[in-house]
Structures are given as C-alpha cells and as structure tokens.
Amino acid sequence: MKNLFNIIGFQLSWWACVLGVKYGYSYFGPLLMFLFIVIHFSIFKSQISELKLIVLFAFIGTIIDTAIANTGILIYNGSYSQELLIAPLWITAMWCGFCATINHSLSWLKEKWILCFLMGAIFGPLSYIAGEKFEAISFQSSFLTVNIVLAIVWGISIPLIFFLNSKIQ
C-alpha cells in the first residue's frame, strides 16, 4: 500500500507540474511535489540517505536539464525567464519526486543495469513527449533528434541514480 502511494503521489505531482505550467501556475506543481515528499518521508520514515539522494539529484537533474536546454533542442515553458537558460523549478521538483520512488515503488530495478538503461531510454523521452503535448516544453529540433538525445541522457541518468543511491546507502 505504501508503494502504491509512492508511485501515485509522484505521478499526480508530476502531472501537477506539467499542467501547472500549461495553465500559467508553474509553482503549483513544485508545491504539490514538496507536499508529496513531506508525506512520503512521514509514511516511509525514510533515512537521511534518501534525503541526500533527493538533494543530490535536485542539483544533478537541474544541471542535466539545463544542459539539454542550452543545446537549443528544447525550451522549458514556465521558466524563470527566456534569457536565463536554467531548468525551471518544476523540472527540479520532478527530479526530486522521481528520486523519492527509487527505494520504494521502483526498488525492483536495483542492480538491473540494462533494464535501468532501457527504462530510462524509453520512458525518459516519453515523459518529455507528454510535456510537449501539454505545452510545458517546446521541441526546437526534429522529433527524432530530441528523442535520441533524451534517450541517451535518460538511459545514462537512471542507472546513475541507482548507482549513486547504492553508494549513499
């Protein structure tokens, strides 16, 4: 039951981030994601190591998505400004929420490196496609180019999250 809350809470918060941007409330999603993480920690009595992972990937994830934006292949809507190419808060919130699933609803992926790579390479781009369909991001390059880049980035990121999680534990 706890893992069900974990994945549903993350998914609801993820959609709140995307739809919040679409409808001009770009801070609604991050607030809901913060609430999800607070409730998550009260339910799971998570260890300090999990908090370290979440904070670490708040930074790493923001850097990754900032780098993606700076390649010019996509634009994040709901950003701080169009001139400042830093991934917006709602993207950082998504990274934090995703990391809260690693030791719980996604724990079955631990040490399954090829599966982690495949899951990242497939579902990472699908998340961005959904974000693009709901106008949270705009692709600036061809659909194929954007998705090849995202597949590579997420194919590496998911195993990296699990690897660093194992080192932090």
List each language-model region with its residue ranges.
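Aromatic-rich, lipid-facing transmembrane alpha helices and their immediate juxtamembrane interface loops
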Residues: 1-169
